Amino acid sequence: ERITPQPLVVQLKLYFERKPDNFGRTLAESLDYGFVCGDVAFLLEAAQFQLLETAVEAICATLLMTPPPDRPSIRPDAVEVSIQKPQALGGKAIPVVTVLRHAKEMQYGIEHNDFGHVDILHENQDCGVYLLHIPAGGQIPAHIHKVMGEAELVMSRGLLLQGQPVDGGIAHLWPLEFVHQYDNPTDTTRTILCVNRPKFDPADEIAVPVPETWPDPRPHRKRFFGLETNLKP
């Protein structure tokens, strides 16, 4: 089962400490469950986890992160993630892994770099999960990876990919040595949820000249949220 992808059943429980009549009236004071569903689906597809245990830990860490500035919401006080693998034992039994994590117990790393900074959400033997912050007017310059697999989920509208607008909720699962560049022409920080396999290695972030013609990213594109959601402009 570590070689062939199998269907999973995921159950999420989000916990909030709230007083009566104090639940918020806008999405910035609540949580958009379309975003939650999209983030989780992206992680499970992009990270190619070999163990249910690492999958649930990565999901917990991502759902409990400080909300991105370009996708404001409240932060859950705790999350419980259960993942079932119905086909793992040929129907004799259904393996289930459940983890409960509280926001107050989470510890996240941060890395400052040339384009902005990165929140290190989770790292394990399979992969790393990161939130890339591109400041207003900033850029992730043209680069490739020769070793790391990489997938990136754009969290809001406003970024340019290869000089063209890319919508929030759109992910790209990049082939090795595929040149890509992001620009942020907006007046606010924009973020990208990034998965590297294995975890990020700065030696494999290889800067390259801007090509005369950008390679087309569309064959590597998939939407995870956005069509049913009011994205922040």
Segment roles from a protein language model:
Residues A136, H145-Q162:
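Glycine- and acidic-residue-biased ligand/ion/polar-headgroup-sensing regions
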